[in-house]
């Protein structure tokens, strides 16, 4: 997998304008929609159980995010996910805060048991808790612990039969056989709420147009990281408010040439 291949997926997303159905959380809905629009995808936020199955069936990808968890949303996620599976629509799952409470952890384990996932994305603590591996967590943003991130990612990919994505200072993408580390991004991303949730939806846009889900995820993470670096270079001294606005600009303006120039990936043995 080389940078030229990866950069082509960015162009394909913009040419295809994929419909991404998001069942996401109330904190990030606006930011997610704007980020997808800036990228060149078409977001839809449909949550009602009466319509989610139909909407999911016509989407390019379905993104399930359990950030602000309620029983009615879990029901909607299951309906949408099963419809997506029947209609060969890739499903992405963001198990926000898995491990923080018993209910949240129960849901985070139930969804992959019921729905076939194209990819799961979270920090190390979240992914570890989904597969019942011990990892310290405090709140929904915890991502540090004492385990091996690559090992956890590979185990999750194998157990859940999916592409596992663990994000942090370095990002890991694996299907259990191919494992790629992405070293793009900027620390200021952690100062803006919703950047992780938006990333999962961006991966959804890439998965909608590239059926090699490992390549799609690597392309999405590299693109997202480079866009954040370009935005930070212009705004980091001003603060996270200015960064957030410029980041949306860079999601629209970052090119395949930028990816080839600034992308940093490594395939592990």
Curated annotation (Swiss-Prot):
Pathway: Cofactor biosynthesis; thiamine diphosphate biosynthesis; 4-methyl-5-(2-phosphoethyl)-thiazole from 5-(2-hydroxyethyl)-4-methylthiazole: step 1/1. Pfam families: HK. Substrate binds at residues 45, 194. Signal peptide: none annotated. CDD domains: THZ_kinase. Its cofactor is Mg(2+). One of its GO terms (biological process) is thiamine diphosphate biosynthetic process. InterPro entries: Hyethyz_kinase, Ribokinase-like. It comes from the Bacteria. It catalyses: 5-(2-hydroxyethyl)-4-methylthiazole + ATP = 4-methyl-5-(2-phosphooxyethyl)-thiazole + ADP + H(+). GO terms for molecular function: ATP binding; hydroxyethylthiazole kinase activity; magnesium ion binding. Its EC number is 2.7.1.50. NCBIfam families: PRK09355.1, thiM. Catalyzes the phosphorylation of the hydroxyl group of 4-methyl-5-beta-hydroxyethylthiazole (THZ). Belongs to the Thz kinase family. This is Hydroxyethylthiazole kinase. It comes from Bacillus cereus (strain ATCC 14579 / DSM 31 / CCUG 7414 / JCM 2152 / NBRC 15305 / NCIMB 9373 / NCTC 2599 / NRRL B-3711).
């Amino acid at each position: 997998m080389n940078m030229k291949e990866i950069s082509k997926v960015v162009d394909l997303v913009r040419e295809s304008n994929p419909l991404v159905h998001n069942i996401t959380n109330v904190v990030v809905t606006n930011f997610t929609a704007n980020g997808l629009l800036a990228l060149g995808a078409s977001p839809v936020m449909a949550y009602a159980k009466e319509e989610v199955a139909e909407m999911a069936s016509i989407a390019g990808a379905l993104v399930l995010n359990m950030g602000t968890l309620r029983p009615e949303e879990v029901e909607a996620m299951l309906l949408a996910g099963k419809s997506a599976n029947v209609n060969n629509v890739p499903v992405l799952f963001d198990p926000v805060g898995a491990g923080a409470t018993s209910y949240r952890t129960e849901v985070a384990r139930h969804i992959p048991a019921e729905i076939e996932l194209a990819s799961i994305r979270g920090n190390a603590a979240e992914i570890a808790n989904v597969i019942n591996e011990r990892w310290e967590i405090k709140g929904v943003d915890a991502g540090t612990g004492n385990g091996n991130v690559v090992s956890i990612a590979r185990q999750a990919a194998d157990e859940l039969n999916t592409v596992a994505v663990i994000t942090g200072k370095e990002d890991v993408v694996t299907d259990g056989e191919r494992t790629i580390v992405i070293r793009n991004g900027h620390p200021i991303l952690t100062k803006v709420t919703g950047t992780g949730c938006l990333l999962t939806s961006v991966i959804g846009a890439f998965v909608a147009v590239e059926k090699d889900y490992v390549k799609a995820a690597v392309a999405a993470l590299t693109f997202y990281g480079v866009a954040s670096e370009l935005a930070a270079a212009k705004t980091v001294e001003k603060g996270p408010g200015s960064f957030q606005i410029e980041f949306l600009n860079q999601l629209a303006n970052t090119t395949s040439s930028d990816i080839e120039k600034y992308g940093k990936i490594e395939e592990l043995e």
